[in-house]
């Protein structure tokens, strides 16, 4: 994801030895609204335009499909809309271009700290590292393996569908009240 790709990019850029272990084969689908703040550009020295699907400068909020509130986003650059499979893979490719190694389709099975290094066991072998970046997402096992208290989880679902034909693509739409304890974006 974006956190792992970003960490890999910056570490590899500094000349560190970086191995990215990705459970899925890249690019991989990820249900997501796809809104990215253009402010991230200042943290990178490459152009994101190849992976920006759309730039959006207006947000519209509704309650039970009525009572609309609309506002222009007051930033220099509009919000970037991206497809997560394309965006995430792009970040990892940037890391690889700086020297990181990618092993996708490589699920981590366990981690263990030995006196001065981490041992990472995967279905494809065991890897050793002095440092470990746990960027496996909110539902990943790393936090538990590292001994962090498990947060109280609430069930949630994500569904991604194409916008209706004729939909105004210059606006991000947020609908509240239609789904209990949730929203539609």
Question: Predicted segments — roles?
Answer:
Residues 1-20:
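N-terminal Rossmann-like FAD-binding beta1-loop-alpha1 element of flavoenzymes
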Residues 37-90:
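A conserved beta-strand/loop capping segment in the N-terminal third of enzymes
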Residues 27-31:
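A short beta-to-alpha transition loop/helix N-cap that caps and shapes the active-site region
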Residues 10, 14, 26, 94-185:
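Predominantly flavin-linked oxidoreductase catalytic cores and closely associated redox partners
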């Amino acid at each position: 994801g974006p956190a792992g790709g970003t960490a890999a990019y910056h570490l590899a850029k500094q000349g560190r030895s970086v191995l990215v272990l990705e459970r899925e084969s890249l690019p991989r689908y990820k249900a997501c609204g796809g809104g990215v703040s253009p402010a991230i550009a200042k943290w990178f020295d490459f152009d994101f335009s190849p992976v920006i699907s759309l730039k959006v400068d207006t947000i519209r909020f509704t309650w039970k499909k009525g009572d609309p509130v609309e506002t222009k986003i007051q930033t220099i650059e509009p919000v970037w809309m991206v497809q997560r499979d394309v965006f995430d893979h792009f970040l990892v490719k940037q890391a690889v271009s700086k020297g990181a190694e990618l092993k996708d389709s490589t699920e981590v099975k366990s981690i263990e700290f030995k006196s001065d290094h981490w041992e990472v066991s995967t279905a494809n072998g065991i890897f050793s590292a002095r440092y470990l970046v746990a960027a496996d997402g909110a539902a990943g096992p790393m936090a538990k393996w590292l001994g962090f208290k498990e947060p109280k989880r609430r069930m949630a679902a994500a569904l991604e569908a194409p916008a209706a034909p004729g939909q105004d693509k210059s606006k991000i739409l947020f609908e509240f009240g239609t789904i209990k304890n949730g929203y539609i974006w």
